[in-house]
Structures are given as structure tokens and as C-alpha cells.
Amino acid sequence: MAFANLRKVLISDSLDPCCRKILQDGGLQVVEKQNLSKEELIAELQDCEGLIVRSATKVTADVINAAEKLQVVGRAGTGVDNVDLEAATRKGVLVMNTPNGNSLSAAELTCGMIMCLARQIPQATASMKDGKWERKKFMGTELNGKTLGILGLGRIGREVATRMQSFGMKTIGYDPIISPEVSASFGVQQLPLEEIWPLCDFITVHTPLLPSTTGLLNDNTFAQCKKGVRVVNCARGGIVDEGALLRALQSGQCAGAALDVFTEEPPRDRALVDHENVISCPHLGASTKEAQSRCGEEIAVQFVDMVKGKSLAGVVNAQALTSAFSPHTKPWIGLAEALGTLMRAWAGSPKGTIQVITQGTSLKNAGNCLSPAVIVGLLKEASKQADVNLVNAKLLVKEAGLDVTTSHSPAAPGEQGFGECLLAVALAGAPYQAVGLVQGTTPVLQGLNGAVFRPEVPLRRGLPLLLFRTQTSDPAMLPTMIGLLAEAGVRLLSYQTSLVSDGETWHVMGISSLLPSLEAWKPHVTEAFQFHF
């Protein structure tokens, strides 16, 4: 998937000026317009291939579907709650974020919230501003020796852990992805959730908002907590059930809460914000000069590197694409698309299971990034719903009635005895298998159904190929075929044959354009098909 034609980017939220400068220095045109309505945003995007947002702009399905040229949405921040990922993926629009940009700022705010909860600093400040001197009212608690439960041990969670350990806190946590060995390396003991609740003096959440994390803290879990537990949410509104939190505060089960995020922002229901034991901020987790600059810089660099084909970072909805930008993998992506296109032309809109098989040490983990490219080749001529690319390929292939499996073989798929890296694409249960490899940076076809080409056939983008199989070696065959090409006004550009396999030979002709029909070829060959990619 190439982004070289991405030329113009709209920045629709406030970002550090370095973002615009980096984009322009990278050769991109930049338009900055903020506070756009949905209709205004759609209008601006009619001439833009890229969009960069922070939190304010809502990139809905309506916006994505109406923006015909849109290729990439960049979120200068961690979450992508304001981008409709399903709609973007279906349309083949890449979504990126800056997962590292605001981690430190969010972690520091969390630590500040924990300290404010322990010593009631905001409440004491408000009291002083009212002219009061209430030393007894604001009795606090030390952090030393207390247990902090951290739910979500990614970048932010681990930064919080190391900082609060310096206050003498014991850190325990839970993360379904991070291994206990990894979390132990930064001082967090992982426990099951049901064991965490009764141990914690403080709980802080650092998970994405998913169906599995919505309402993670609820009436049931609050009931399992220590009486007087304190809760911090600087992650996403909705992870803590706001109704359950209010009830826990009112009953004293929860001694205090610090909230930077809400289910609705700004919150119209003020019951939580107005509670005397709640500290709240208007979503300030990433609101530092450093984070703003870092996020703006990172997303701009990601755009420029992507357009120049250097690298692809921060991908949210097509992680396999990241591998597609490595110098080693790029030509294999081209080969995979070519073999997918060949398979569709050969098998005629195949149904069932397509097998993608890799061989060779350097391709051991490449199946997940090569299979979308195979799908692009299979579907790009057939899909009536959308343009097929590496972003939406896996979604659209299911709707086309195809399953795609990937596997790695220590031995060559098809013809045995070759030690190089190979890629094979086959239709399960049917006599269709194509094998290719990369020579230098050129994808080449090595074999069809066990018939091996020596030398291999170059697969060049834009060069039509005509492939046909014959049973006998008739000296008059080649002049006859050239005559058929001439009758159709098509020139022969190259010609190669396979080694004889089971008494038959495959022939490959590079031709100046695809033939309007292969009917005239059928009396002379066992089978024939043509394609270009």
C-alpha cells in the first residue's frame, strides 16, 4: 500500500506549530482550521488525503464515508475514541496515533491525583480561599506503606508504578497482555482482579475503553474493596461506573476519587463533580506543553516517514502494515499481491480457503503481513463495495466468501529441494498452487502446480502476462500463438517456459496489453489465463 500520493493534510485541532513545520518540510501541503462543524469538516476533506486531530474533532462514519480522498487519519495522542475505527477500516483508511507522546504527562497527573487524594490539597486550598483555617477537617494519610492497585500496565501504568514506588507504596496490578515476568521487572506484582480489590488502599486505571473494561469498577467490585479505598481515573470515562462510584462515595466505601475523564465530556450530571470528596479536572492528562509538542511532532514525523516509505509507526487498525514498510518485506508484499491476482485470474473468482504458505527463516513471522496483500490481489478487481487495500483486506475477504489461512513450512511448498525463501498461494482442495520468491527486489514466479520455471518469471507491476499450458511441444505452436497476438493487435514482449512436468509445459508471455478474449486460444492449449497487477 503506497502513500506517495498523499499530498495535502488538514489539521483540525490545536497542535504545536512544530507539527505544521515538519509536515511542510516533508513536502506536504497543510491546512489548519479548527472548530469545524461536521459539514465544514467534510467540505475541507474533499481536497485532503490526510487528517490530523486531537480530541475535539469527531471523525465519524459520516465524515469518513464522505471524504473520498481520505487515506490516513492521525490522532495526536494515545486514544482514538473520537475516530470510528470500524468505518475507517472498512473504507481502507489508515488510523494512526502517538502512543508515547503523552505517556509521561498522563502518568505525572495520575501521581499528582494520588497525592491530592491522600492529603486533600484541592479541598484545603478552596477552604483557604474562603478565608477559613480548617486544620482538623483535612486530616490526610501517608502514602508510605500503602498498596496501590494499577489496572493496565502499559506505558502509563508502568510510569505511575515506578514513581509511586519512590513514595514507599507497594504496587500490585493486573494486565491481560503484559506477562507477570515483565511487570515484575518494574516492581509490580500481578494478581487476579478478585484478589486485587480487597488489598488496595488506592486504585488507578490505565486501560483502553473496551467492552471488557467498561464498568470495570462497579457496585460489585466496590463491595469487594477495602472500606475507604481511593480511586483515580485519568484514562477513559466509563471504565469506572460513575453511578456506582457516587454510591460508594455516599456510603463511605470509597473515601475519595480523582477524575480527569468522564463518560460525557463535559459532564452535564454534576453529582460526582460536586461531591466534596471528588477531585476533578477537565481532561488534562495530555495538557502539558511537552506532551502537546511531543504528540504534534510525533504524528507529523509519522506522516512524513509514511509518505516517503521509510517506516510506519503508531498504526491502530492495520498493525500488519508496519512490517510492510521494512526494506526486506516490501518486495514480498508486491509478490503476495501478484500471486493473489494470478490466483484470481487462474481459478476464476475462487471460493473456499486460500492457503498462504511461507518458507525460510526470514519469512517465519511474515504470514500475517503477506496474507492481506494476497487478499488485495484476490479481491481488487472483484470488490464492488470499496477499494481493497492492506487496511480493509481481512474485513472484506470474509464478505467475499473466502477464508485465508497462513502457515510456515520448513520445507519448500510445492517443489522440494530449494533452500531459498518462498511464498506459495494455493486454493485448498483444488489444483491451483503458485510459488514465488524475491530476487534482489524483484518478485518472480517460480512455479505453477509443481511445474518449475528456470529462470524464474519476473512479475512486474503493470506488465500483462499471458499464461497457458500445453501437452506437447509442437514446433508450430509458438508462431501460431504470436499470430493470434498479432490478430488482436498485441505485441509479444517476453516469453518463457517451465520445465516439463507430467508431460506438460507452462508458457508465460509478457504482452503489451491484455487480450479482449482467450476464445481463439482454447483449441491450441489445455488452459489459459491472463492477468496484470
UniProtKB/Swiss-Prot annotation:
GO terms for biological process: L-serine biosynthetic process. The modification N-acetylalanine is found at residue 2. The active site is at residues 236, 265, 283. There is a cross-link at residue 21 (Glycyl lysine isopeptide (Lys-Gly) (interchain with G-Cter in SUMO2)). Keywords: Acetylation, Amino-acid biosynthesis, Isopeptide bond, NAD, Oxidoreductase, Phosphoprotein, Serine biosynthesis, Ubl conjugation. Its EC number is 1.1.1.95, 1.1.1.399, 1.1.1.37. The modification Phosphoserine is found at residue 14. The modification Phosphothreonine is found at residue 78. Pfam families: 2-Hacid_dh, 2-Hacid_dh_C, PGDH_inter. Homotetramer. This is D-3-phosphoglycerate dehydrogenase. It comes from Macaca fascicularis (Crab-eating macaque).
